[in-house]
Structures are given as C-alpha cells and as structure tokens.
A protein has these predicted regions:
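Short hydrophobic beta-strand that contains or immediately precedes a catalytic carboxylate
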Residues: 94, 263, 371-372
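Membrane-helix interface motif
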Residues: 8-16
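Gly/Ser/Thr-rich beta-alpha loop segments that engage phosphate groups in nucleotides
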Residues: 8, 79, 84, 260, ...
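TM-adjacent membrane-interface loops and short helices in multi-pass inner/ER membrane proteins
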Residues: 243-297, 305-309
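Transmembrane helix boundary and interhelical junction motifs in multipass membrane proteins
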Residues: 144-149, 276-281, 292-294, 356, ...
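A juxtamembrane structural motif centered on a specific transmembrane helix
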Residues: 354-403
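Hydrophobic alpha-helical transmembrane segments of multi-pass inner membrane proteins, especially
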Residues: 3-4, 8-9, 23-255, 302-359, ...
Length: 403
C-alpha cells in the first residue's frame, strides 16, 4: 500500500497538465519508479527462495563487502549535491550506503546472537557500537550526514540488548546542548550548567562519588558547549552549516537555503483539512517545492490530500512499525529478533527525519521516506531489509543454525 501510494504521489509531484505524460511513461520519475518496483518484486522472490539460514551465515562476509564499497566510493564515487556517495555506471547509479544498512544490521544481529557473554556487558556493547560506528564514519566522510544519522539510530539495538538507559539520556543531552548553544548566549548557558551542577551536588549529599560525577559531567558539558563553534565552522561543510542555521532562523535566507522548507510548509498548510485533490496541487504544479519526488514527497500528500491524508499516511507507517516490533518479539532465535529491531530502527529513523525535515523541525539532510520516495537504491534497500525479516519470521519455529 505504501509503495503504490508513493508511486501515485511521485507522479503527482511531477504532474504538468500542459504536457500530459502518462504515469507509465519512462520520461517521468513515476515511470522509472515502476521499473524499481517490479525489480523489487524480483528481489522479494529471490529472498523467499533462498534458505533462511544463509542470512546468518554470510552476515560478516557481506558486512566486510559493504565496508569495502563504502571505502571505494570515497575514491571512485560520483559527487552529487556535495556528497561523494554514488557509483555511476552509465545511466545506472548505485549508492552503497543504502545496501550497507542491510549489512550492518545483519552483522549486529549475528554478533549479539552468537555472543557467549551477557550482551549487556560493556565490552560486548562497545563492539556492537563499533559495528555501526565504522560505516557511519565512512558515510560522514562522503559528506552524507543524513544517512550517517540513520546509522546512528542503531544505538536502539544496543539498548534492546541491555545498554544502560543513562547512555541514551547522555546522547539526548548532547543534542539538546548543541541546539541550545546555537540559539542561546554561550556565557548564560555555561552559567546555567554550573548552577545546575551545584544544585545536583546539594541534592546528592556527602557522596563523594556522585559529587565527582556531577563535576565531571558539568565540565564535559561546558567543554562541549565551547566546542560547538569548532564543530559548526570546521567539521560541517558550508552547505551543512547553512542547513543547520536555516533551522534556527528559516527567515534569514528565505530565497536561498530556507526556500525548500518554506515552500514545503506552504504546500502542506495550503492543503487544509481535506486537501486540494489528486493532481490539483498548485505548489506542486508550478514547481515551488524542490526535490518533491524524493526528500519532500510528504508535502505532496499534505497539499493534495490535506491533514486527513497526512494522518492516514502516518498511521500506515506506525502500523508497520508496531507490526515489526510484534514480529521481532515473537522470534525464537536471537538473530531474527535482533535483526527485526535493527530493521525497525532504520525505517523509523527515515520516517521521523524525513517528516521532521519536511515540516521544518529538522535541517534538510536528504533522507527519503521509506517505500514512498522516488529512488531505486533506497527502495531496494528497504525491500531487502523488510523481506529478509519476513523470511526469518516465516521460519521462526526452526532453530537458526549456521549452514
């Protein structure tokens, strides 16, 4: 349902009443997407025909191949929109970071399921962390911060395998501090951290260990606040800096970096409750919203199907996520269960980041909406991720053994 709805909206996003291209025409993105859809059906057939145990057996080998591809694309890849993350072979283009998501989830599932020690142990957690940190860094080196953030979502797999919640809270604090540093006076923020640390020290009483922890945390927080300028100006690329600043102040450059989000919000808002009707979107017809078949496909739904259509789409995604969680929790093998959590993490990250980006709650980072946006590499990646899990679920009553 998501794929067909996405295909129809890809056509709507490019529809021009003066040209009258058929939805099946290969001159349109919708026509080309149809090729990817049918090829995905072929992928599903292959997945279902293969022995379910092979995914466990080849996980490390496939992970290694993905790492090699991520390294190779740094040297031989094609640069698109500031990111060197594509292999180009004539008219065929391939993004290895998409299929590498599958490789990373496989490797994490195998590692945690085969561990002879408790998965909550620090050494096991660190190794699991490194399994997705390495490709995450390689993707960052390609200049694709959005996809790197998707890899970061696999931290929830660590959480499912016993990672202490304090680590997740710490990561959230880092994000909040980063945002506050951009919007608030740096001196006032540091004073606030010091006062908060003093309050905590007063509450913990005479516990030296807790007092030292509060002091170290405060010093680390202050150090991070002071380093944000370096991160923003020296680590992020110019186009990424502009995207972050446009989130803080979208009106600073309404005709430049802020144009995409502004027009997307106008399109969504103009749809009202019921929308303007299929193929009747004025923002869409006159190409006000850039990249509307890919990154901003949700704005097409908002304009033409309105608030009701947007809610229905979100409900479909939530239903999918809840179903994946249910299936993961009923697995008889650790490999299948952990793999399911990984699939859920990847899909949810794409869903949340794409919609947040479209409505102006997150910087524009080039993240497709799963099964919905135009693109062959992403559709193949999502198809493989999901249907391998469904294949494992179909054999859940059998003990997963290495071939």
């Amino acid at each position: 349902m998501l794929v067909i709805s996405g295909w129809l909206n890809i056509y709507a996003a490019e529809y021009n009443p003066d040209i009258h291209n058929s939805i099946f025409s290969f001159n349109t993105s919708a026509g080309r997407q149809l090729i990817w859809i049918f090829s995905s059906v072929g992928l599903i057939s292959v997945i279902m025909l293969l022995d379910f145990r092979i995914y466990d057996s080849v996980s490390y080998l496939f992970y290694g191949l993905c790492i090699l591809l991520l390294i190779a694309v740094l040297f031989f890849g094609k640069e698109v929109a500031g990111s060197r993350s594509w292999f180009s072979l004539g008219s065929f283009e391939f993004q290895p970071s998409e299929i590498a998501k599958f490789g990373v989830v496989l490797a994490m599932a195998r590692y945690f399921s085969k561990s002879t020690r408790k998965t909550s142990e620090l050494r096991i957690q660190i190794t699991g962390f490194l399994l997705f940190l390495v490709p995450m860094i390689l993707v960052l080196l390609q200049g694709d911060a959005g996809t790197a953030m998707v890899y970061g979502s696999l931290v929830f797999v660590l959480f499912s395998e016993g990672m202490h919640p304090v680590i997740l809270i710490g990561a959230l604090v880092v994000v909040i501090l980063f945002i506050l540093t951009l919007v608030a006076n740096q001196l006032f923020l540091i004073i606030g951290i010091i006062l908060f640390a003093i309050l905590i020290i007063g509450l913990v009483g005479k516990s030296i260990r807790k007092i030292m922890l509060a002091i170290v945390t405060a010093l680390a927080s202050i150090g991070f606040v002071l380093s944000v300028d370096f991160i923003l100006n020296d680590v992020l690329k110019p186009h990424q800096q502009k995207r972050v600043m446009s989130l803080i102040n979208p009106n600073a450059d309404p005709l430049g970096i802020g144009w995409n989000v502004t027009q997307s919000k106008i399109a969504i808002g103009s749809g009202g409750l019921l929308g303007k009707g299929y193929l009747e979107g004025t923002q869409t017809k006159f190409d006000f919203v850039p990249k509307q078949t890919t990154d901003f496909i949700f704005s097409t739904i908002g304009e033409e199907q309105g608030w009701i259509g947007s809610v229905v789409l979100i409900a479909l995604f939530i239903t999918l996520f809840l179903r994946i969680i249910y299936l993961a929790n009923r697995q008889k093998s650790g490999f299948a269960r952990i793999y399911g959590y990984g699939v859920m993490s990847i899909l949810f990250a794409h869903f949340a980041l794409n919609i947040a980006m479209t409505i102006g709650l997150f910087p524009v980072i080039g993240i497709p909406l799963p099964f919905f946006s135009y693109g062959g590499s992403s559709l193949w990646s999502f198809t493989v991720l999901l249907f391998v899990f469904l294949k494992l679920d179909a054999h859940r009553m059998q003990v997963l053994q290495r071939i």
